[in-house]
Swiss-Prot record:
Highest rank taxon of the organism: Bacteria
InterPro entries: DUF3798
UniProt lineage: Bacteria, Pseudomonadati, Spirochaetota, Spirochaetia, Spirochaetales
Any Pfam family matching the protein: DUF3798
Record organism: Treponema pallidum (strain Nichols)
Protein name in the entry: Uncharacterized protein TP_0014
Protein backbone atom coordinates (compact mmCIF):
# COMPACT_ATOMS: atom_id res chain seq x y z
CA UNK A 1 0.00 0.00 0.00
CA UNK A 2 1.29 3.46 -0.93
CA UNK A 3 0.07 6.78 0.46
CA UNK A 4 -0.05 10.00 -1.54
CA UNK A 5 -0.95 13.45 -0.23
CA UNK A 6 -2.79 15.78 -2.61
CA UNK A 7 -3.30 19.36 -1.49
CA UNK A 8 -5.58 22.10 -2.79
CA UNK A 9 -3.90 25.54 -2.90
CA UNK A 10 -4.83 27.38 0.32
CA UNK A 11 -5.75 30.62 -1.45
CA UNK A 12 -8.40 28.86 -3.59
CA UNK A 13 -11.39 29.43 -1.29
CA UNK A 14 -14.40 27.10 -1.33
CA UNK A 15 -15.47 27.71 -4.94
CA UNK A 16 -11.90 27.65 -6.18
CA UNK A 17 -11.28 24.38 -4.36
CA UNK A 18 -14.34 22.80 -5.97
CA UNK A 19 -13.14 23.90 -9.39
CA UNK A 20 -9.67 22.52 -8.61
CA UNK A 21 -11.18 19.15 -7.67
CA UNK A 22 -13.28 19.16 -10.84
CA UNK A 23 -10.30 19.71 -13.12
CA UNK A 24 -7.82 17.44 -11.33
CA UNK A 25 -9.75 14.31 -10.29
CA UNK A 26 -9.51 12.74 -13.76
CA UNK A 27 -5.75 13.40 -13.76
CA UNK A 28 -5.35 11.84 -10.30
CA UNK A 29 -7.24 8.69 -11.30
CA UNK A 30 -5.23 8.50 -14.53
CA UNK A 31 -1.98 8.83 -12.60
CA UNK A 32 -2.71 6.56 -9.63
CA UNK A 33 -5.29 4.16 -11.12
CA UNK A 34 -9.01 3.40 -10.65
CA UNK A 35 -8.33 1.32 -7.56
CA UNK A 36 -6.92 4.32 -5.70
CA UNK A 37 -8.92 4.94 -2.52
CA UNK A 38 -9.43 8.67 -1.91
CA UNK A 39 -9.92 10.14 1.56
CA UNK A 40 -10.86 13.81 2.03
CA UNK A 41 -9.94 15.58 5.29
CA UNK A 42 -12.03 18.69 4.52
CA UNK A 43 -15.78 18.25 5.01
CA UNK A 44 -16.48 21.23 2.72
CA UNK A 45 -14.90 19.53 -0.29
CA UNK A 46 -16.01 15.93 0.21
CA UNK A 47 -19.27 16.09 -1.78
CA UNK A 48 -17.50 17.79 -4.72
CA UNK A 49 -14.82 15.10 -4.73
CA UNK A 50 -17.37 12.31 -4.46
CA UNK A 51 -19.42 13.70 -7.37
CA UNK A 52 -16.30 13.54 -9.52
CA UNK A 53 -15.48 10.02 -8.34
CA UNK A 54 -19.05 8.85 -9.02
CA UNK A 55 -18.81 10.05 -12.62
CA UNK A 56 -15.32 8.59 -13.09
CA UNK A 57 -15.79 5.22 -11.35
CA UNK A 58 -13.44 6.22 -8.51
CA UNK A 59 -13.29 5.13 -4.88
CA UNK A 60 -13.65 7.03 -1.61
CA UNK A 61 -13.52 6.18 2.08
CA UNK A 62 -14.79 8.22 5.03
CA UNK A 63 -17.92 9.89 3.65
CA UNK A 64 -21.19 10.02 5.57
CA UNK A 65 -24.65 9.05 4.34
CA UNK A 66 -25.60 12.68 3.60
CA UNK A 67 -22.45 13.25 1.50
CA UNK A 68 -23.34 10.16 -0.53
CA UNK A 69 -26.96 11.24 -0.99
CA UNK A 70 -25.90 14.66 -2.32
CA UNK A 71 -23.22 13.23 -4.61
CA UNK A 72 -25.62 10.63 -6.03
CA UNK A 73 -28.59 13.00 -6.39
CA UNK A 74 -30.69 11.26 -3.71
CA UNK A 75 -33.16 13.67 -2.12
CA UNK A 76 -34.01 13.50 1.59
CA UNK A 77 -35.86 15.49 4.25
CA UNK A 78 -33.94 17.16 7.09
CA UNK A 79 -35.87 15.18 9.71
CA UNK A 80 -35.71 11.84 7.85
CA UNK A 81 -34.29 8.75 9.52
CA UNK A 82 -30.77 7.90 8.32
CA UNK A 83 -31.67 4.25 7.62
CA UNK A 84 -34.24 5.32 5.01
CA UNK A 85 -31.73 7.61 3.29
CA UNK A 86 -29.12 4.84 3.33
CA UNK A 87 -31.52 2.43 1.58
CA UNK A 88 -32.01 4.87 -1.30
CA UNK A 89 -28.28 5.59 -1.46
CA UNK A 90 -27.61 1.84 -1.72
CA UNK A 91 -30.14 1.58 -4.56
CA UNK A 92 -28.51 4.49 -6.40
CA UNK A 93 -25.08 2.87 -6.03
CA UNK A 94 -26.39 -0.40 -7.49
CA UNK A 95 -28.09 1.49 -10.33
CA UNK A 96 -24.85 3.26 -11.24
CA UNK A 97 -22.84 0.03 -10.89
CA UNK A 98 -20.65 1.48 -8.16
CA UNK A 99 -21.09 -1.33 -5.63
CA UNK A 100 -18.08 -1.71 -3.36
CA UNK A 101 -16.43 1.61 -4.29
CA UNK A 102 -17.53 3.87 -1.44
CA UNK A 103 -17.04 3.38 2.31
CA UNK A 104 -19.28 5.37 4.65
CA UNK A 105 -19.71 6.09 8.33
CA UNK A 106 -23.38 5.24 8.80
CA UNK A 107 -23.58 7.23 12.03
CA UNK A 108 -22.34 10.83 12.13
CA UNK A 109 -19.25 11.00 14.34
CA UNK A 110 -19.96 14.64 15.28
CA UNK A 111 -23.59 13.90 16.22
CA UNK A 112 -22.79 10.72 18.16
CA UNK A 113 -19.71 12.20 19.88
CA UNK A 114 -21.69 15.22 21.08
CA UNK A 115 -24.59 13.20 22.48
CA UNK A 116 -22.40 10.32 23.70
CA UNK A 117 -20.02 12.58 25.64
CA UNK A 118 -22.99 14.45 27.12
CA UNK A 119 -24.53 11.15 28.24
CA UNK A 120 -21.19 10.03 29.69
CA UNK A 121 -20.92 13.28 31.69
CA UNK A 122 -24.54 12.96 32.87
CA UNK A 123 -23.90 9.46 34.19
CA UNK A 124 -20.86 10.67 36.11
CA UNK A 125 -22.71 13.65 37.62
CA UNK A 126 -25.71 11.53 38.60
CA UNK A 127 -23.56 8.67 39.88
CA UNK A 128 -24.93 6.23 37.30
CA UNK A 129 -21.63 5.17 35.73
CA UNK A 130 -21.51 1.36 35.84
CA UNK A 131 -18.23 0.82 33.99
CA UNK A 132 -14.98 1.82 35.70
CA UNK A 133 -13.02 1.73 32.43
CA UNK A 134 -13.56 5.08 30.68
CA UNK A 135 -13.16 3.49 27.24
CA UNK A 136 -15.89 0.89 27.84
CA UNK A 137 -18.19 3.51 29.38
CA UNK A 138 -17.74 5.87 26.42
CA UNK A 139 -18.38 3.11 23.88
CA UNK A 140 -21.57 2.19 25.75
CA UNK A 141 -22.74 5.84 25.79
CA UNK A 142 -21.99 6.28 22.07
CA UNK A 143 -23.98 3.13 21.21
CA UNK A 144 -27.15 4.69 22.64
CA UNK A 145 -27.25 7.20 19.77
CA UNK A 146 -26.14 5.07 16.84
CA UNK A 147 -28.46 2.21 15.99
CA UNK A 148 -26.58 -0.70 14.43
CA UNK A 149 -23.12 0.91 14.64
CA UNK A 150 -20.35 -0.64 16.72
CA UNK A 151 -17.82 1.59 18.48
CA UNK A 152 -14.40 1.01 19.94
CA UNK A 153 -12.57 3.47 22.17
CA UNK A 154 -8.81 2.91 22.44
CA UNK A 155 -5.80 4.70 23.97
CA UNK A 156 -4.54 7.70 22.02
CA UNK A 157 -0.84 7.86 21.10
CA UNK A 158 0.78 11.22 20.35
CA UNK A 159 2.49 10.71 16.98
CA UNK A 160 5.04 13.41 17.79
CA UNK A 161 6.29 11.75 20.98
CA UNK A 162 5.07 8.14 20.73
CA UNK A 163 3.57 8.38 24.23
CA UNK A 164 0.00 7.59 25.26
CA UNK A 165 -2.02 10.63 26.31
CA UNK A 166 -4.11 9.67 29.34
CA UNK A 167 -6.88 12.24 28.86
CA UNK A 168 -7.35 11.55 25.12
CA UNK A 169 -8.84 8.56 23.30
CA UNK A 170 -9.08 7.28 19.73
CA UNK A 171 -12.62 6.46 18.60
CA UNK A 172 -13.38 3.92 15.84
CA UNK A 173 -16.59 2.72 14.23
CA UNK A 174 -17.20 0.05 11.61
CA UNK A 175 -17.26 1.28 8.00
CA UNK A 176 -20.07 0.28 5.65
CA UNK A 177 -19.07 -0.43 2.04
CA UNK A 178 -22.08 0.63 -0.05
CA UNK A 179 -23.82 -2.29 -1.73
CA UNK A 180 -21.64 -4.90 -0.04
CA UNK A 181 -20.84 -5.29 3.66
CA UNK A 182 -19.40 -3.62 6.73
CA UNK A 183 -15.67 -3.58 7.43
CA UNK A 184 -15.19 -4.67 11.08
CA UNK A 185 -12.80 -1.86 11.99
CA UNK A 186 -13.65 -2.25 15.68
CA UNK A 187 -12.30 -5.83 15.65
CA UNK A 188 -8.87 -4.84 14.34
CA UNK A 189 -5.75 -4.51 16.45
CA UNK A 190 -3.51 -1.57 15.61
CA UNK A 191 -0.08 -3.03 14.66
CA UNK A 192 2.67 -1.91 17.03
CA UNK A 193 5.02 -1.05 14.14
CA UNK A 194 2.77 1.85 13.16
CA UNK A 195 3.02 3.35 16.64
CA UNK A 196 6.69 4.03 16.00
CA UNK A 197 5.96 6.35 13.05
CA UNK A 198 6.74 9.96 13.95
CA UNK A 199 5.27 13.05 12.34
CA UNK A 200 7.24 16.29 12.56
CA UNK A 201 5.49 19.60 13.06
CA UNK A 202 4.67 21.46 9.83
Amino acid sequence: MRLRRLQIPQESGVEGARAFIGTHTKQWIGKYGKNTMFFCTNDTHRVSLMRELVSKDGMLLGANVFDCAEALGVEYADDEDVSGILERVESAVEEKRLVGRFGVNVSSHIFVSTLGLTEYARRILQNELREKDMRVALSDAFSLFSKGTRWRVAPYTDLLTGKEVSNHVSVFSDIHILGKFSLPVTDQEFPEKYRSIRFGRQ
